[in-house]
Amino acid sequence: MGEDVKNLNYAQLKKLRHEVESNIASNQVGQAIADHEETISHCLHCNSHQLNRWGMTRQGIQRFKCKSCNKTFNALADSPLYRMKKSEKWIEYTKLMWEGVSLRKSAKALDITLRTSFRWRHMFIKAPASFNPSELTGVIEADETFLPESFKGKRVIDRKSRKRGGGRIKQVPIFIALDRSGAVSHKVLERNTKENIQAQLKPLLSSGSVLCTDGNLSYKGIAKELDVDHKRLIPLDNQLVIDGVYHIQTLNNYMKRWKGWLKRFNGIGTDYVENYLSWFRFMEDNGEYSDQTWIKEAL
């Protein structure tokens, strides 16, 4: 076979490489799905644990039939990958996502439509976006950041056309809180009010935690109402660190990295900000890319 490969021209080698990489990707996706199939223990319809294996789909995905309700489902029915086609391209697509490649360039690289590229992006983000920590511990840093309101990706804009030079663009508030263990919680707020901030912050506070914020008076009132130890860091008073431990620099650095990463997308629609927050958090949590990282998360 080695001699045969040597006799191939550049175009043939390129085609062979593509076929080999596609086969490897398909095997890795198949292995991840097979591993997932072994974890299925209850019916998606009635939650019964009385299941029978019930053949395969045309794509080779295991089907199950519930003895209790007689309904059937396949192993991907409860995952974002359900009904997604072209599985041989999934891993390469997630690699392009990790690199922050645009939808258009990803579509061209994998010979898929722009619509498919868009749908895949948000399908792979769906699993990370479904998770938000229920509680933060220890030293908790909290603050808001802002992005210009954007209707990018919307067919219908729910406002009158903006006149040229017609004032400032509305800023969308985003609440972010994290602890020193690396857990991050985020939420796009309708308005930057004390009530909205408190609604997001209150469930995150745990016993014995210390809240670190900037000088925003909303946090002062919230901390008093919730009876939580509160450290206010006020730059104008040159107070950036208290007792060598309490600061919001970890959070500020996180926000800076996120906004720096966002620049490659040339603006994102406000409706999708939560997804991009989750996407970035997912990559930060994993540290580096591996071929099955996103596939396993989606399952």
PLM region descriptions:
Residues 1-299:
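Residue-level recognition of single "structural anchor" positions
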